From Swiss-Prot:
The gene is hisG. This is ATP phosphoribosyltransferase. It comes from Cupriavidus metallidurans (strain ATCC 43123 / DSM 2839 / NBRC 102507 / CH34). Lacks the C-terminal regulatory region which is replaced by HisZ. It holds the Pfam family HisG. Pathway: Amino-acid biosynthesis; L-histidine biosynthesis; L-histidine from 5-phospho-alpha-D-ribose 1-diphosphate: step 1/9. It comes from the Bacteria. It catalyses: 1-(5-phospho-beta-D-ribosyl)-ATP + diphosphate = 5-phospho-alpha-D-ribose 1-diphosphate + ATP.
Length: 224
């Protein structure tokens, strides 16, 4: 790891992803007296300063947040429950449900497809998803036979072109499903974003982390 990347022993590094999670984390940081001083949507920088010289933000893919925190490249981060369910919790402590970026993970099929009857008859379904581990566990518990097809985006396209019978994906308003003539048939789990902390950092930097974690907890409780 290059010296330019390394933080000082007293500095805290927060891992965030662009988009909804970043935007909805800003008020929580403000509650801790911290402002991110550059916008990741307009800046090319991946390491952003904050109003607190002892705290910096790194911008990573949403699915990579737990990895950066697990291996200590970040002291703490914000990740969706969907990401954490796929990644696992090794080396991580997740003390707070932040009550942000809420949605649900669901099974969806083309309108007119009799999902309940297909499952009842023991049909083997092709399911497109990027949440392979979570989907596998869900269908195994229900005794549903599936072939899982890993995709990284545009899940809705799978059933439309005959790649899959169903999809497992995140649903917020359901507008994308409706636009593609898909219907939600089964909710797997409610999703929100969690604060995740590196277990070693929690011990070694507790004095610096504790006030921020407390502020996050108070602010997120108001959102519940």
């Amino acid at each position: 790891m290059s010296p330019a990347f390394n933080a000082s022993p007293d500095q805290l590094t927060l891992a965030l992803s662009k988009g909804r999670i970043f935007k909805e984390t800003l008020p929580l940081l403000a509650a801790a007296g911290i402002q991110v001083t550059e916008d990741p949507e307009t800046s090319r920088k991946l390491i952003l300063p904050t109003s607190d010289p002892a705290v910096r933000v790194i911008i990573v893919r949403a699915s990579d947040v737990p990895t950066y925190v697990q291996y200590g490249a970040a002291d703490f981060g914000v990740a969706g429950k969907d990401v954490l369910m796929e990644h696992g919790m090794a080396g991580l402590y997740a003390p707070i449900d932040l009550n942000i970026a809420r949605c649900r993970m669901s099974v969806a099929v083309p309108a007119g497809f009799d999902y309940v009857n297909a499952v009842r008859q023991g049909a083997r379904l092709a399911v497109a998803t990027k949440y392979v581990q979570t989907a596998r566990e869900h269908f195994a518990k229900k005794g549903v036979h599936v072939d899982l097809i890993k995709l990284y985006g545009s899940m809705e396209l799978g059933p439309l072109v005959g790649l899959s019978d169903a999809i497992v994906d995140l649903v917020s308003t359901g507008s994308t499903l409706r636009a593609n003539n898909l219907v939600e048939v089964e909710e797997i789990v409610q999703i929100s974003s969690r604060l995740v902390v590196n277990q070693a950092a929690l011990k070694l930097k507790r004095e610096r982390l504790a006030p921020i974690l407390d502020a996050f907890e108070r602010a997120s409780a108001a959102l519940a």
